[in-house]
């Protein structure tokens, strides 16, 4: 039990402010002890692949991801049905059952608490990932997906996402770019952009104008998914594609410490990038 902060806080508070000072010092000391306890709950060793600590770090990443998702969902003041459904859908995509699913649900609920220590949790994520860019990026993208659960990002959710991005070491510009990419990815997916023909392709020729407009929108979203302009040449397209695939390759992420439960989501992200690239490649006519 950690009471060092409480003792010091109460002592100096009483010394300078009497009884009321002691009470205030006790409160400050409690906050200090809480932050110290959370910090010590993290992982102090560096690097993945050190025997048992690998599993511990993966568990930290896993639970923190769902806890922060809960925090994002609560940003508007009330968690919507769509956000709960998204969290459940993510658990389904990760094939979480039994104890694992309960752990994810418990973490999500913890994130909704008013005094959720976001900064300390993000610091533990950075320690657990050894600050690896691609793992931190994957963590941030999970939170962006959660924010888009009900189709739009509320200003309060955007503010929380900026806090998360800063806590993980990303700039506001980097976050806004990823928000644009994720929004484009959702539209692209709804229009049948991932692996296969567009849903509306069987419609009659009388809808040709609508289909052409839809195809144009899909292409525009494909460029946004890769983070490039529509006038990018073949070399620029390939460079952006290879960079994103290198950052999101499931096997590489697993080797660096991504929890195995999140492997399917990493595969979906790489398929999203591949589908966008294939559409652009077909449009520009290069191999």
UniProtKB/Swiss-Prot annotation:
- The residue ranges for the Cytoplasmic side of the membrane come to 31-287
Q: Per its UniProt entry, which superkingdom is the organism in? A: Bacteria
Taken from the UniProt record, the cysteine pairs bridged by disulfide bonds within this chain are none
Q: Name one GO molecular function term.
A: protein-folding chaperone binding
Cite the InterPro entries for this sequence.
DjlA, DjlA_DnaK_co-chaperone, DjlA_N, DnaJ_domain, J_dom_sf, TerB-like
Q: Does the keyword Transmembrane helix apply?
A: yes
Under the heading Pfam families, the entry gives:
DnaJ, TerB
Q: Which UniProt keywords apply?
A: Cell inner membrane, Cell membrane, Chaperone, Membrane, Transmembrane, Transmembrane helix
Q: Domain J, which positions?
A: 221-287
Question: What topology in the membrane does the UniProt record assign?
Answer: Single-pass type III membrane protein
Q: Which residues form a coiled coil?
A: none
- SUPFAM superfamilies the record matches: Chaperone J-domain, TerB-like
Q: Where are the transmembrane segments?
A: 7-30
Subcellular localization, as worded in the UniProt entry: Cell inner membrane
Instruction: Return the GO cellular component terms, semicolon-separated.
Output: plasma membrane
Against PANTHER family, the record matches this protein to:
CO-CHAPERONE PROTEIN DJLA (PTHR24074)
**Which HAMAP family does the annotation name?**
DjlA (MF_01153)
Domain remark text: The transmembrane domain is a dimerization domain.
Assembly and oligomerization: Homodimer.
Function, in words: Regulatory DnaK co-chaperone. Direct interaction between DnaK and DjlA is needed for the induction of the wcaABCDE operon, involved in the synthesis of a colanic acid polysaccharide capsule, possibly through activation of the RcsB/RcsC phosphotransfer signaling pathway. The colanic acid capsule may help the bacterium survive conditions outside the host.
| Official protein name in the record | Co-chaperone protein DjlA
> Which organism is this protein's natural source?
Vibrio vulnificus (strain CMCP6)
């Amino acid at each position: 039990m950690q009471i060092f902060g409480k003792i010091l806080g109460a002592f100096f508070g009483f010394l300078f402010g009497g009884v009321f000072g002691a009470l205030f010092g006790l409160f400050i000391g409690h906050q200090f002890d809480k932050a110290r306890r959370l910090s010590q709950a993290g992982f102090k060793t560096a690097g993945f692949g050190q025997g048992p600590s690998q599993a511990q770090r993966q568990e930290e990443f896993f639970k923190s991801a769902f806890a922060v998702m809960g925090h994002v969902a609560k940003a508007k003041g009330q968690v919507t049905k769509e956000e709960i459904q998204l969290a459940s859908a993510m658990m389904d995509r990760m094939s979480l059952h039994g104890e694992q699913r309960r752990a994810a649900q418990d973490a999500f609920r913890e994130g909704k608490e008013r005094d959720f220590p976001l900064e300390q949790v993000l610091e533990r994520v950075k320690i657990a990932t050894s600050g690896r860019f691609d793992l931190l990026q994957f963590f941030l993208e999970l939170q962006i997906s959660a924010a888009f659960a009900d189709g739009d990002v509320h200003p309060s959710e955007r503010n929380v996402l900026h806090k998360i991005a800063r806590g993980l070491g990303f700039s506001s510009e980097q976050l806004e770019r990823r928000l644009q990419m994720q929004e484009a990815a959702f539209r692209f997916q709804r229009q049948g952009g991932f692996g296969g023909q567009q849903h509306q392709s069987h419609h009659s020729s009388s809808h040709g104008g609508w289909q052409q407009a839809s195809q144009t929108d899909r292409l525009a979203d494909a460029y946004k998914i890769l983070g490039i302009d529509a006038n990018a040449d073949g070399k620029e397209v390939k460079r952006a594609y290879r960079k994103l695939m290198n950052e999101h390759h499931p096997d590489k992420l697993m080797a660096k410490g991504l929890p195995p439960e999140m492997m399917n989501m990493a595969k979906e992200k790489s398929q999203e990038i591949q589908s966008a690239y294939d559409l652009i490649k077909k449009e520009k006519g290069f191999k």
